[in-house]
Every structure is written in structure tokens, then in C-alpha cells.
């Protein structure tokens, strides 16, 4: 905390029995004999605290809480938009109520369990992103399936070779056109097998 506590103020430590949080607050000297209501900024639980009883607590316990807040590194003054401390004080006597000025700082130390939970959340490894199949991979997969449906006896290697040739010979497929036709041409299901030219029968001339 950057601002130093005025000598007329006294630091008191209040334990929230609802969320197990230690609240460190500074109270002006003229309010030390009052019964105040402390609002926990962690769980918003209201606590009625007798400051006179806190002043008679053991000094060693106060020093322990102060040392714990310094080591945790989470101590700080939390203020709302109006400038008042987040843990508002009000003197709750039978006849009057008193709200402390903004100079009365309020600090909070989260429990060790909450610290471990936050560290575990930040230490999670980044999830691996699944790569989206490219247009080529999607086309080859669908083309092999189509070729095998039309020709069940074809091998996977031949179907893959034919699908790759269809991708190379029909570039408009790259732009999302129908895989069945491209420019009036039909996709090849299998590679054509060259055949020997057939002999033609020569008819003779009759005289």
C-alpha cells in the first residue's frame, strides 16, 4: 500500500468466518470503542465486530496477520467509484451510525486455497487446435469415394492416382464447382487403358 497510515489510526484484523478471509482495516482512533459492521469484499458477508475486544487481542496474533498479508502480495486498497473503501465501515450503535472517511484503507488477503486455484487455471497448457482439411484433401477424399462407388474392383492406389489427375486436369474444382462436371467435361473414374487398333475388313470390288 503506497499511502502510509496516519498515527491516529489503528490497524485491526478481522476474520471472516464465511469465506475464511482475513480482513485488515485501519480505523480512526475516535472509533476504537465502537461496535462496527464490516462488509467482506470477498463474499460480501457482514460481520459485527467489537473493536474494543480486538484491541485487547494478543499483539503476536496481530503481527502474524500483518506479516501474512505482506508475504501474500495480494494486499491492496479496493475502492468503489465513489472513492470509499470496498470494505465499508459503519458504527452500529443503538442510536447512531458512522461511516469512515475514504482515508480508512481496507485490505484483503485471499485464502491459500483460492491462490492455488488461480495458479492452476493460469498453468493450464494451451489446447491443441485441430487443423481444418484443405480443399485438396477434401476433394481427394470425396473423389476416391466416388471412384470406388462406380468401380468397386479398383485398388486404392489407382483410385488415388485418378483422383489426383482429376484435381490437376479440372482446375475449376478448386473454386468450389461441382465435382461431377467441369466445363462440359465429366470426371474420369479410371485411367483409360490403351487398346490395339482393330483390323478392318477390306471389301473387294466386283467387276
Curated annotation (Swiss-Prot):
A family per Pfam: YABBY_N
Swiss-Prot/TrEMBL keywords: Metal-binding, Nucleus, Zinc, Zinc-finger
Tissues with expression: Expressed in leaf blades, leaf sheaths and flowers.
Transmembrane feature ranges: none
Compartment list: Nucleus
Cited CDD domains: HMG-box_SF (cd00084)
GO cellular component, one term: nucleus
Primary residence: nucleus
Record-linked InterPro entries: HMG_box_dom_sf, YABBY, YABBY_C, YABBY_N
Disulphide-bonded residues: none
Protein name, UniProt field: Protein YABBY 6
Amino acid at each position: 500500500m503506497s499511502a502510509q497510515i496516519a498515527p491516529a489510526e489503528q490497524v485491526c484484523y478481522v476474520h471472516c468466518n464465511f469465506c475464511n478471509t482475513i480482513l485488515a482495516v485501519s480505523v480512526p482512533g475516535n472509533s476504537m470503542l465502537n461496535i462496527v459492521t464490516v462488509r467482506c469484499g470477498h463474499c460480501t458477508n457482514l460481520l459485527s465486530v467489537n473493536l474494543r475486544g480486538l484491541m485487547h487481542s494478543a499483539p503476536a496474533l496481530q503481527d502474524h496477520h500483518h506479516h501474512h498479508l505482506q508475504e501474500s502480495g495480494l494486499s491492496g486498497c479496493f475502492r468503489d467509484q465513489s472513492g470509499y473503501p470496498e470494505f465499508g465501515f459503519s458504527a452500529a450503535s443503538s442510536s447512531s451510525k458512522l461511516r469512515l472517511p475514504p482515508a480508512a484503507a481496507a485490505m484483503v488477503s485471499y485464502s491459500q486455497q483460492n491462490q492455488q486455484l488461480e495458479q492452476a487455471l493460469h498453468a493450464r497448457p494451451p489446447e491443441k487446435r485441430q487443423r481444418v482439411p484443405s480443399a485438396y484433401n477434401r476433394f481427394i477424399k470425396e473423389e476416391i469415394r466416388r471412384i470406388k462407388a462406380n468401380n468397386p474392383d479398383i485398388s486404392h492406389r489407382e483410385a488415388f492416382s485418378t483422383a489426383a489427375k482429376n484435381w490437376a486436369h479440372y482446375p475449376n474444382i478448386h473454386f468450389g464447382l461441382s465435382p461431377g462436371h467441369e466445363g462440359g467435361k465429366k470426371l474420369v473414374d479410371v485411367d483409360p487403358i490403351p487398346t490395339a487398333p482393330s483390323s478392318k475388313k477390306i471389301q473387294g470390288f466386283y467387276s
